[in-house]
Amino acid sequence: MDDKPNPEALSDSSERLFSFGVIADVQFADLEDGFNFQGTRRRYYRHSLLHLQGAIEDWNNESSMPCCVLQLGDIIDGYNAQYNASKKSLELVMDMFKRLKVPVHHTWGNHEFYNFSREYLTHSKLNTKFLEDQIVHHPETMPSEDYYAYHFVPFPKFRFILLDAYDLSVLGVDQSSPKYEQCMKILREHNPNTELNSPQGLSEPQFVQFNGGFSQEQLNWLNEVLTFSDTNQEKVVIVSHLPIYPDASDNVCLAWNYRDALAVIWSHECVVCFFAGHTHDGGYSEDPFGVYHVNLEGVIETAPDSQAFGTVHVYPDKMMLKGRGRVPDRIMNYKKERAFHC
């Protein structure tokens, strides 16, 4: 039985304000097809670039063009580093993105750090922090240079926030640095396995090397931005490579301190949805506080005859994801206004 909602049929109920594109885990490499670590799922390394091309052509030809595209991380595969092809593969993907007629906001995932150091990424075309919007007279909403996160306003009364899920991580960091030592200590405290990418026997399986977490500094900043959005009655979309809600994700793929991120988000009224990648399988759930968690299906594990991307149409009362291929359609109604008591 197909209970998939039909956004086209429901879109007449209110005027569309704007739209934006979403895509995750392209993981391009100029290699023949392979499999995941367990050898159970095929990965289409070379064809992923053609999927990206198809998505860009689709967005460019939409009757109401998206205002921007959110790229949810893992844009090239870690295998590139083994073949000394990281820069070349990134250049091919970025050349493809040049065909897109709207801005793209890039999130960083584990595969970015398999290929490049954090310092390299900070000075690369994958750093789209220059697209941020600064809130005048509110310095507390300015992100630190210590992590890669920012916010922007695609449309009045809507704010998008990109988070750095590898702010706490042993990936892409100088191994002689205090930050590396701090993050390795966190990882070792929760994961005694010799192979740190293995969740075997862990009570908290998210503590593996291919995941990361949010520093307290970044969470404090997120809290300040959400406080501003609450006060100014903005609707907020949050983006991260790593998911933070267990019901929408494999537990092995969650951010290390996902509970801390949820605690911040749940203390505010303004957040509509949280987009993530990383799982490749996709996932979806509405949490008890009315926040929708959308984990996008990964391009890398999408067969040549399918697709994996979407366009989110934004209305005064809801957001509607129109998926392509493996990505299902979703309807995300805004929370009903709660009464404020003095």
Curated annotation (Swiss-Prot):
Catalytic activity, EC: 3.6.1.13, 3.6.1.16, 3.6.1.53
Carrying N-acetylmethionine, the residues are 1
Q: Which GO terms describe its cellular component?
A: cytosol
Question: Any idea which positions bind Zn(2+) 2?
Answer: 74, 110, 241, 278
Signal sequence range: none
Q: Which cofactor does it need?
A: Mg(2+)
Query: What's the top EC group for this one?
Result: hydrolase
Record Gene3D superfamilies: 3.60.21.10
Which UniProt keywords are present, listed alphabetically? Acetylation, Hydrolase, Metal-binding, Zinc
The protein's matches in Pfam families, at most eight in alphabetical order, are given as: Metallophos
| The keyword Acetylation belongs to this UniProt entry's keyword annotation | yes
Annotated family: Belongs to the ADPRibase-Mn family.
Q: What does this protein do?
A: Hydrolyzes ADP-ribose, IDP-ribose, CDP-glycerol, CDP-choline and CDP-ethanolamine, but not other non-reducing ADP-sugars or CDP-glucose. May be involved in immune cell signaling as suggested by the second-messenger role of ADP-ribose, which activates TRPM2 as a mediator of oxidative/nitrosative stress.
Instruction: Describe the subunit structure.
Output: Monomer.
Q: What is this protein called?
A: Manganese-dependent ADP-ribose/CDP-alcohol diphosphatase
The species this protein belongs to is Homo sapiens
